[in-house]
Amino acid sequence: MKKIFSYLPFLMVIVLVLPALLPLLNPGFFVMHDDEQVGRLFDLHASLAAFHIPPRIVPNLGFGYGYPFFNFYPPFAYYIGEFFHLLGFGYILSTKLMLVSIFIASAYFMYLFAKQFLGKVGGIVSSVAYTYASYRAIDVYVRGAFAEASSFPFIPLLFWSLYKLQ
């Protein structure tokens, strides 16, 4: 029973973060400024399938001649999506699962960091506030900056790691 209660704060964080993920439950994909995310995941998969490691030039852009897309845009977020695609999910669902994992990871790491200073309740509140920050919603659901959004888990993880090193 004690083991179950040790996971309770993390489960509360996940439940409180779920409404931020509601736009991902709609069928298809949502409209945003940079709405080529699924195509980029498709091109990353095509590059990896052709053993272009690390993928730099994607084969389907540039009118079929290829385009050095991943020289200019960081591919980390798409590797997360590729993981889900290799598990058998389609490209659209893999992209949505990529966003879900980014949101949950950033909420979890913010909880770990804030718990050190504010306790469990403060960690939960900080985690939810970090998830619902308006900049994050604009970043994902308006701008479509998934590479930038994939950096959000690392900010509290970095500070938590530095605190733990002391």
Tell what function each PLM region has:
Residues 20-35:
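Helix-to-loop transition at the C-terminal end of transmembrane segments
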Residues 34-42:
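Loop-to-helix transition at the N-terminal end of transmembrane alpha-helices
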Residues 61-89:
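Short hydrophobic/aromatic helix or loop-helix immediately within or flanking a transmembrane segment
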Residues 13-20, 85, 98-117, 121-166:
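Membrane-embedded helix bundles of polyisoprenyl
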Residues 37, 76, 106, 110:
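Hydrophobic (often cysteine-bearing) scaffold residues that line and stabilize catalytic clefts
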Residues 41-66:
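Extracytosolic helix-loop segments that constitute the early lumenal/periplasmic catalytic or substrate-binding loops
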Residues 1-23:
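Start-transfer (signal-anchor) and selected internal transmembrane alpha helices
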Residues 66, 91-95, 143:
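Short alpha-helical transmembrane interface motifs in multi-pass membrane proteins
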